[in-house]
């Protein structure tokens, strides 16, 4: 541990959970893409056979044509972009606090030293050949391809226990996505709010152009691949609104089979949708199993107390002296206290209509019962719920009461002070509470996902979310000790989710496989603690609270009741006989009055008191036996917590389908990301560059600020080899000429391409080169100028392919330049180093200058203080936006980490760090749109 708790101050220990028994395949980092074998880099093709024999089935336009062939999914490899260990960040703050207090900071272990856990003799570049430590995963990309890659390349087929799928509720593109980390205000019809992220727009273009028909195709394809990932006992939960719940349920039955349907759960929305008629306040969660006969299910319970709906039928009370009566209205309304020792109960059914069982005279469990001098038989259509021996024990335990013409079972409220949850979850509130703050435009309440995960999984099981959003599924899975993989097409969503996970605080639940857990289990179960050796294996689960569950069956099978009855009969029967003799009566047990008659002789009064005292004691002993023999229900949502410890998220990786998600540059010329695809092919059809030029003329080139836009006064084709357009814009009052270079529709622009285009532009007398491409190879990033000619690299968004779907208004930021970060490396007097982020260098077309934008446009920035050119480890993290992901941790650890250390998390200057052993550091800067740029420094 980084810091041991002080006995005097009661300091908290910061810890985390790891899944030591679980492994994952060794996959490439973005840095290793250049050494991939060709067969590893080449996308595979995965086929899922269609089921053409479905009857009945949901039909939509285009389904027949799709069913003519199998579902074919291209399976690209995944690349690790970042490795994150949140505990390492907290350990660094603890060390800084120690140093500020002039105490010797404890040497903290390097949590990244064995992050992978690869076998020592294994070649780290032999991808997909070795297993390594499990780390949770946050993946950028189309969920269809990502899930197929997990199944085919990484062997996760049949390994996922639970999938929580929250697809768009309908086909309105804008309302489902968020365009910036700084704003949740997304309006349909606002062109400025339409997301411009390539992965999302591709999903939109491919999905919604044919309305509900495309929507159903989108869902069916992903559900098909998702089913392939599930274990035989696995479950999928699909959250959907009332607009499409009927279609989606039919679609799930097509994919999983109607026999795999488990439940349709109704949940209350945070706000009602208005309409002409009734407002919609209900959303739905559809629960389907991979195999209905083997589904893993853990019951969850709600409370059942007097005054609640679940206890509405509990209308009677038995007092401590065994007298019974109805509850008063004030008692039922909780306006009056019950007498001490009183137990609330209801008169429940003691007969059964079991189908297929014989009933009537001579049938099993059909017999007369003598009670209070009467003989009661069940009707000819029913039978008792127990046999004759069981009925005698129920009578002996005072669990049977005579009603007007039959018998009833006495069911106490505390027999089972909980109630199994059903499919109506209207008790789940919204997500604007302090405990569950909203950070994303479409965000699911934590409690909703928590219930689903707890019902269908155990600690250590794997949970997958194909639609990450704000990361709620990952947050819940992390809290409850489940492994998780979350996927999204939005870089904004993943930026928010990453910050949320990095700064989250979780309770530390007692592991069953720990010494503290063994001690707690012994205490709760009232047994001697286990002496078995412990290993901290989370798959053994937690130590849970539990409630007794007394049933009619457990009482009927409790043979100890017979023994207790016989023992007390030896006391009660002589007293009854003496009482009858004194009063010259022949009372049976049930006829003895509760209160004595004042006219009785003193001897009879004492016998009466002794008899009732023994009778009450017998009842208490029988009740104690019933409670001791009762089964228990575990409360899986209430594990015992060790409040001396604080838990942060375990290690996780940030990954993507493409190795070119970030642009990496080295100030000293050394390169971070040597990823490169084959040479870009520029044999694009004339239609593609022509379409790009048309949009470029209308939209211009946007930088971080709205004012910093290159607005072209004219733009025409140019007959060059690489330069294909000539644009004119104003710099002050002077007109300038821009050469337009357009990269391939599919592929990556390399440095050599930019150099050649810049030379061509310089020879032709242009004032600036504007390169437009979907991806830039890492060598290009530090190439910003060739002689006098500035080179601007604009990233094109993939919605340029969808002119028919998104109107070209010129306001969509189709061509965006996220400039190179302006970073200073500082050296302190003690030889340690700091990094200062000044902002982002941007080209101002109005003046022709390159200026620093300042830090306002930066959402967060990370440092790998010992960059080994193999992986980017997030060793320092700083958040410059308005959100504070460490808010809850700051409150919990206010005694362990001082305010000055916390304040460093929001600065533009890093905390000091020693000279890296590798001789290099890497700095990654992320803006509010999710764009990432990385820069490498050689530290002498």
Where are the regions that the model predicts?
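N-terminal auxiliary segments of SAM/dcSAM-dependent transferases
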Residues: 303-416
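S-adenosyl-L-methionine-dependent nucleic acid methyltransferase catalytic domains
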Residues: 1-325, 371, 396-399, 403-940
């Amino acid at each position: 541990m980084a810091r041991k708790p002080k006995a005097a101050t009661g300091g908290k220990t910061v810890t985390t959970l790891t899944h030591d028994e679980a492994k994952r395949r060794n996959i490439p980092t973005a840095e290793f893409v250049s050494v991939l074998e060709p067969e590893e880099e080449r996308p595979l093709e995965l086929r899922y056979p269609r089921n053409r024999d479905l009857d009945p089935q949901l039909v939509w336009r285009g389904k027949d044509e799709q069913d003519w062939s199998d579902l074919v999914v291209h399976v690209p490899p995944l690349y690790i972009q970042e490795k994150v260990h949140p505990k390492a960040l907290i350990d660094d703050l603890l060390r800084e606090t120690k140093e500020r207090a002039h105490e010797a900071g404890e040497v903290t272990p390097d949590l990244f030293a064995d992050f992978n856990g690869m076998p020592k003799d294994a070649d780290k570049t032999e991808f997909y050949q070795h297993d390594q430590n499990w780390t949770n995963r946050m993946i950028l990309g189309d969920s269809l391809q990502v899930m197929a890659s997990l199944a085919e390349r990484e062997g996760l087929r049949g390994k996922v226990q639970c999938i929580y799928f929250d697809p768009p509720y309908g086909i309105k593109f804008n309302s489902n996505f968020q365009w910036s980390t700084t704003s949740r205000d997304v309006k349909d019809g606002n062109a400025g709010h339409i997301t411009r992220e390539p992965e999302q727009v591709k999903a939109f273009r491919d999905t919604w152009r044919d309305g509900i028909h495309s929507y159903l195709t989108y869902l069916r394809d992903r559900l098909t691949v998702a089913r392939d990932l599930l274990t035989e006992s696995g479950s999928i939960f699909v959250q959907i609104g009332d607009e499409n719940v009927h279609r989606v349920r039919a679609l799930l039955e097509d994919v999983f089979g109607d026999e795999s349907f488990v439940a349709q759960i109704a949940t209350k929305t945070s706000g009602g949708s208005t309409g002409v008629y009734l407002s919609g306040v209900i959303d739905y969660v559809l629960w389907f199993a991979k195999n209905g006969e083997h589904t893993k299910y853990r019951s969850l319970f709600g409370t059942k107390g007097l005054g609640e709906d679940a206890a509405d039928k509990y209308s009677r009370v038995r007092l401590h002296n065994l007298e019974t009566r109805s509850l008063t209205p004030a008692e039922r309304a909780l306006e009056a206290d019950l007498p001490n020792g009183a137990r609330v109960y209801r008169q429940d059914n003691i007969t059964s209509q079991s189908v297929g069982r014989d009933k009537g005279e001579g049938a099993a469990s059909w017999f007369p019962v003598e009670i209070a001098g009467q003989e009661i038989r069940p009707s000819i259509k029913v039978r008792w719920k127990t046999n004759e021996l069981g009925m005698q024990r129920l009578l002996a335990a005072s669990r049977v009461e005579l009603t007007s013409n039959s018998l009833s079972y006495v069911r106490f409220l505390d027999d089972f002070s909980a109630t199994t949850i059903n499919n109506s979850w209207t008790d789940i509130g919204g997500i604007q509470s302090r405990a569950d703050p909203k950070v994303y435009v479409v965000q699911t309440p934590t409690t909703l996902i928590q219930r689903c995960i707890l019902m269908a999984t155990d600690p250590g099981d794997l949970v997958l979310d194909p639609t990450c959003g704000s990361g709620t599924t990952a947050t819940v899975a992390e809290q409850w000790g489940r492994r998780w993989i979350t996927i999204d097409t939005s870089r904004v969503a993943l930026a928010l989710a990453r910050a949320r996970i990095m700064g989250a605080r979780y309770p530390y639940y007692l592991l069953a496989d720990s010494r503290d857990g063994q001690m707690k289990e012994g205490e709760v179960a009232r047994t001697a603690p286990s002496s078995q050796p412990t290993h901290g294996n989370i798959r053994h689960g937690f130590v849970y609270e539990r409630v007794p569950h007394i049933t009619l069956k457990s009482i009927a099978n409790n043979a100890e009741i017979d023994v207790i009855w016989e023992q007390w009969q030896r006391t009660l029967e002589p007293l009854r006989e003496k009482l009858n003799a004194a009063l010259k009566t022949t009372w049976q047990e049930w006829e003895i009055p509760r209160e004595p008659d004042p006219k009785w002789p003193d001897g009879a009064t004492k016998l009466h008191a002794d008899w009732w005292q023994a009778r009450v004691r017998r009842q208490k002993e029988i009740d104690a036996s019933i409670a001791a023999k009762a089964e228990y229900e575990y409360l899986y949502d209430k594990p015992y917590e060790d409040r001396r410890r604080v838990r942060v998220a375990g290690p996780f990786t940030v990954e993507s389908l493409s190795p070119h998600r970030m642009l990496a540059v080295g100030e000293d010329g050394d390169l971070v990301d040597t990823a490169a695809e084959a040479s870009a092919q520029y044999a694009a059809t004339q239609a593609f560059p022509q379409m790009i030029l048309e949009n470029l003329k209308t939209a211009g080139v946007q930088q971080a600020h709205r004012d910093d836009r290159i607005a072209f006064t004219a733009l025409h084709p140019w007959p060059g080899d690489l330069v294909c357009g000539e644009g004119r814009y104003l710099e002050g009052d002077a007109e300038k000429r821009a050469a337009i270079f357009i990269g391939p529709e599919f592929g990556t622009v390399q440095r050599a391409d930019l150099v050649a285009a810049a030379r061509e532009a310089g020879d032709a007398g242009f004032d600036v080169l504007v390169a437009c491409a979907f991806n830039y190879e890492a060598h290009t990033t530090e190439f910003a100028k060739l002689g006098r000619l500035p080179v601007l690299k604009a990233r094109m968004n993939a919605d340029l392919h969808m002119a028919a779907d998104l109107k070209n208004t010129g306001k969509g930021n189709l061509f965006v330049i996220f400039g190179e970060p302006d970073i200073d490396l500082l050296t302190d007097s003690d030889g340690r180093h700091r990094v200062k982020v000044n902002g982002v260098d941007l080209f101002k077309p109005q003046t022709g200058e390159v200026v620093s934008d300042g830090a306002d446009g930066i959402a967060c920035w990370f440092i790998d203080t010992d960059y080994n050119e193999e992986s980017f480890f997030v060793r320092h993290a700083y958040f410059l936006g308005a959100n504070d992901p460490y808010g809850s941790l700051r409150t919990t650890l206010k005694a362990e980490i001082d305010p000055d250390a916390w304040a460093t998390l929001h600065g533009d200057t890093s905390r000091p760090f020693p000279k890296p052993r590798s001789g290099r550091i890497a700095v990654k800067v992320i803006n509010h749109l999710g764009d990432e740029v990385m820069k490498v420094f050689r530290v002498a």
